[in-house]
């Protein structure tokens, strides 16, 4: 259990197992333990996926936007449990996702996650 309200990338990497190039959150700017958080993903032209998606008009793939949301949610949950390095989280489903605006190099994505419920070891986030 952590009492900090903001986390930099070094702190995030102590909780999440993801590493470059798949760590897709850069900072936690606000967290209320067991309730919700706000995370930031800074998108730069140096992201490896921009080489092929799409070379002339780079756009962050939707599946990686979802992954950044999953990582923020995992951080929210793992930050509240004792000994988070001994826990495994698995993303199992998503519903009602819509992408209205493309994310391009130079954008800063704000990810807000809210804990809805925990039941029988399953976590529902919004």
Predicted regions and their residues:
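HotDog/MaoC-like acyl-thioester-processing domains
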Residues: 2-4, 17, 33-34, 103-107, ...
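Hydrophobic beta-strand-centered segment that forms part of the acyl-chain substrate-binding groove
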Residues: 2-6, 73-112
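Short aromatic-glycine motifs in intrinsically disordered, low-complexity regions
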Residues: 7-19, 86
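Beta-strand-rich interaction surfaces with strong enrichment in secreted/lumenal proteins
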Residues: 13, 56, 99-101
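Catalytic strand-loop segment that frames the active site of acyl-thioester-processing enzymes
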Residues: 19-60
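Hydrophobic residues on conserved beta-strands that form the core of alpha/beta folds
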Residues: 25, 91-94, 124
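A residue-level detector for short acidic-glycine micro-motifs
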Residues: 27-30, 96, 101, 115-117
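Active-site helix/loop of acyl-thioester processing domains in fatty-acid/polyketide metabolism
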Residues: 28, 60-84
């Amino acid at each position: 259990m952590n009492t900090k309200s903001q986390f930099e990338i070094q702190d995030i990497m102590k909780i999440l197992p993801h590493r470059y190039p798949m760590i897709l959150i850069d900072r936690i700017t606000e967290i209320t333990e067991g309730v919700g958080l706000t995370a930031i993903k800074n998108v730069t032209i140096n992201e490896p996926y921009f080489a092929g998606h799409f070379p002339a008009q780079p756009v962050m793939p939707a599946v990686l936007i979802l992954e950044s949301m999953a990582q923020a949610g995992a951080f929210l949950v793992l930050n509240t449990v004792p000994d988070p390095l001994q826990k495994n989280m698995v993303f199992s489903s998503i519903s009602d996702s819509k992408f209205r605006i493309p994310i391009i190099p130079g954008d800063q994505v704000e990810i807000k996650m809210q804990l809805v419920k925990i039941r029988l070891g399953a976590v529902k986030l919004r």
